[in-house]
Structures are given as C-alpha cells and as structure tokens.
C-alpha cells in the first residue's frame, strides 16, 4: 500500500494466465451492458444522416507492471510477503459524433488484472484511507460498470467512463451524462477540484474518472465564462438524494494579464466558497486557490499556492514548480493513530470519496520537468509533509519510442519514521503482538502504451 493513498492494483501476466483471463472475459461479458452499449451506438447513429456527421474516434491499449517491496512490519508483508508483483492491461475506445451543435460521446474501458495485489487485497479490512479494490458505480446515478471475474490473482471488468449528449452554440454549452470536469489552479494539490481529482503522486493522469452530471457553460463576449454543474449520486441504499449530490457554480474572468475564479457550491451537505487567481510574476507564473467550507460542526479553510518557472540549463529545457498546500481537514500535529483518525470524520469521508489524498495539514511539493531530448522527458518530484517531516520522492521518465508508442517508468521512495504519513501509519492491527503499518520500502512501475 503506497503512502498517500495511491493504490493501483495491477497484475503479473504469464502468457497462459493472460490468455485464459481474456478468454473468460470474452465469454462472461454482461449481456445488459453489451445491449446498453449497442443501444448507445444506435442512438449515436440516429443523430442525423451519416453524410452530415463528424465522427471522433481514438483510444489506447496499455500494459502496466508494478513491483513493490515492503518492510517486515508492513501489514502488506504479513498478507503477501516481502514484495508484490502485479500487471494490468487496459483498453480504452473513445467514440464521439457531432452534427451542427449537437454531440454525443461514449468511452468504453476494459481492464484485466493479474497479480499479488488483487489476491491479498481481498483480506484487507475496510480501512477508509484505502480506495476501492476495483472501480464501481455504486454511488453514481447510472451503473455502467460490470465486473466480469474476480477470483484468486485475477480480475477483469469493463465499463463506460464517458456517456453524454450535449448541445453547443457560440456562447452556451449544455451537456448531460457521464463526463469529467477539472477546476482550480493547483498544479499538484487541487482543493478546488473536488470532482474525482487526481492523486498528486499518480503516474498516469491522462483521463479523470467520469461522473454523472448536468453541465452548463455561458461564455461572455469579453472571454469571461460561467460554469455550473449538478452531480447526481446515490446514497449507500441506492437512493438518489440531495444529501449526496453536488451543485456548483464557478465564474472565470480576466483582468489585464491576470485571471481569476469565484466558486460557490453545495457539496454533499457542506457549503463551500472559493476563489483563485493566476498572474505573471518575475518571468514565471504565480497561481493559487483559497477554499472555505462550512461543515455541520466547523468552518474549514484550505488553500494552495504555486510558482512555476521555465529556464534552460546545460542546453536542457526545464520547467519547475514549487507548491505549498494547506489542508484544513488534515490531522493537526501529525497524529495519524487509528483512534485520532477515526475522530476526524470530515477527513475520512473525503479520503473515502477520493477527494483528498493527504492526511496532514501542511505540504510542500517540488517538481521539475526536464527535456533530456525531444522524445525523453525526465520528471523528479518530491511531496513533503511539513508537519511530520516525512516525504515521498518520485522520479518519472517518459519516452516516446515511436509514432503512437510511449513508455513510462517511475520509481517511488517513501522517507520517514514509523507513524508518519509517508513512513507508514499504524493500522491498529497487531500481528504476533506487534503493531503493523501501511508502509512501503520502494516501488517501481513500467507502462507501455499504444495510441490509436
């Protein structure tokens, strides 16, 4: 389990295991989802005559291998041994059609997993600081995910990550269905982007997970715009209720060479106000967001500010960013004991919903994107918890090896003593009378992607 909650099961495909899994997947595809997908495609075809349509297609096929090493007092070490090896195969096909102002989109995903993590994660207790083992739509309006198989070391599923229809004019956009939006000015930490944000330490940030929502935008003649969303969800009992939905408005404007954002939202049952700005400073860009959330018990402040700058060093183009983040929902004084975390319901709820990925309050993130060659980008990152002194050091290497082919390599090294966020928080579970931790020695990831 990687500190910071980024936990992506991914599998070890022996050729025979992969062939068996794909064969099983082809035989077990859900009839209901298959029929639903066919009806979507027929609906897209019926938008208008074929000659008048504009079609957009694309996608990828990705293979990922992940290896992780664990210390002897890690709870994962007790379940799976001193190391885990996992592989994942991911296929995505994006289909869109446009006619005059109308458009419709359907993005299909298939994932096949084989490895140690899929197997041992079934035995992990329901810890709120860990994400779901597999993607699901339990709390979304539409259930567009079907798990084909989940047994032993293998799992497979398919889903529709986008499914929406919309209408666009010169000044307005209206769209309903499964889609994704990104708000806020944070480069690494994103407190204003509370709709399925990326984990700051995620290696592949190509697609956000979609949510079922009604989205609208009005563009003014001066370039300013107003966006509004209504994200519709189901509660734990499957009921559609306003207690778990989100309604938000965000105004984006320009003043001279600066930009600003103003946000007002009701997210679940909390009221949120926010503001952000971007402007040039000293040859670089200064940006940030401030958020104020009124919960049932308190008013919580969060904020992020970053400075990015580009330069040339040793004939290499470099773009660097330094970002500070204050998480008002985080644990004070670096106390991450199970008892203390259990008392912080606001934090635990946001981690469980995938809105936050940090346990503490004060953070510093440093990142530099170095263009080693036009086809090789090297990115060292550091995520530092200023409250407890722990950190996660990460190096990502991106290689464009051929037309439409890309390799990603990444190494993660957590630093910190036991009881700290990145050094390993205590699970509250004892093995042989000794405490266990959510800790990792180091991990390595390899990903090969083909785009079409």
Go through each PLM region and give its residues.
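Outer-membrane beta-barrel "beta-signal"
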Residues: 436-452
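Detector for outer-membrane/organellar transmembrane beta-barrel domains
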Residues: 284-383
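Transmembrane beta-strand segments of Gram-negative outer membrane beta-barrel proteins
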Residues: 53-79, 104-106, 224
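Transmembrane beta-barrel strands of outer-membrane/channel proteins
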Residues: 59-67, 106-112, 176-178, 228-232, ...
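Residues that define the transmembrane beta-barrel architecture of outer-membrane proteins
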Residues: 83-91, 156-161, 168, 208-212, ...
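Residues on the lipid-exposed face of transmembrane beta-strands in outer-membrane beta-barrel proteins
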Residues: 91-97, 162-167, 214-218, 249-253, ...
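Repeated loop/turn-to-beta-strand initiation elements of outer-membrane beta-barrel proteins
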Residues: 101-104, 171-174, 223-226, 255-262, ...
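Outer membrane beta-barrel
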Residues: 98-226, 231, 416
């Amino acid at each position: 389990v990687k500190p910071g909650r980024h936990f992506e099961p991914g599998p070890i495909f022996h050729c025979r295991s992969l062939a068996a899994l794909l064969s099983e997947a082809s035989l077990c595809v859900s009839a209901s989802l298959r029929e639903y997908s066919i009806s979507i495609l027929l609906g897209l075809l019926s938008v208008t005559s074929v000659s008048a349509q504009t079609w957009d297609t694309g996608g990828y096929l990705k293979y990922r291998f992940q290896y992780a090493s664990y210390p002897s007092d890690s709870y994962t070490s007790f379940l799976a041994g001193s190391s885990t090896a996992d592989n994942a195969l991911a296929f995505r096909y994006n289909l869109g059609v446009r006619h005059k102002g109308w458009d419709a989109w359907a993005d299909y995903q298939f994932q096949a997993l084989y490895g140690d993590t899929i197997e041992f994660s079934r035995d992990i207790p329901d810890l709120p600081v860990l994400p779901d083992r597999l993607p699901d739509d339990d709390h979304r309006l539409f259930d567009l995910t079907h798990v084909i198989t989940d047994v032993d070391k293998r799992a497979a599923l398919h889903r529709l990550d986008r499914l929406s229809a919309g209408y666009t004019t010169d000044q307005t956009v209206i769209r309903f269905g499964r889609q994704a939006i990104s708000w806020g000015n944070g480069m690494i930490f994103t407190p204003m982007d509370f709709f399925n944000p990326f984990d700051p330490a995620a290696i592949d940030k190509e697609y956000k997970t979609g949510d079922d929502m009604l989205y609208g935008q009005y563009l003014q003649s001066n370039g300013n715009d107003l966006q509004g969303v209504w994200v519709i969800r189901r509660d734990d009992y499957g009921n559609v209720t306003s207690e778990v939905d989100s309604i938000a408005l965000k105004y984006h404007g320009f003043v001279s060479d600066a930009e600003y954002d103003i946000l007002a939202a009701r997210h679940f049952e909390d009221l949120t106000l926010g503001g952000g700005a971007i402007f040039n400073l000293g040859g670089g860009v200064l940006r940030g967001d401030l958020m104020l959330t009124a919960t049932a018990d308190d008013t919580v402040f969060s904020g992020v500010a970053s400075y990015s700058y580009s330069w040339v060093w040793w004939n290499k183009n470099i773009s660097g960013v330094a970002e500070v983040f204050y998480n008002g929902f985080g644990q004070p004084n670096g106390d991450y004991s199970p008892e203390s975390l259990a008392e912080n319901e606001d934090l635990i709820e946001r981690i469980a919903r995938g809105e936050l990925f940090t346990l503490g309050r004060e953070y510093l993130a440093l990142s530099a994107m170095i263009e080693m060659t036009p086809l090789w980008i090297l990115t060292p990152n550091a995520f530092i918890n200023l409250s407890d002194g722990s950190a996660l050091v990460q190096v990502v290497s991106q290689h464009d090896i051929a037309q439409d082919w890309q390799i990603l390599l990444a190494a993660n090294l957590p630093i910190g003593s036991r009881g700290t966020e990145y050094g390993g928080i205590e699970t509250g579970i004892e093995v042989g009378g000794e405490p266990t931790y959510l800790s990792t020695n180091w991990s390595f990831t390899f990903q090969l992607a083909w785009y079409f």
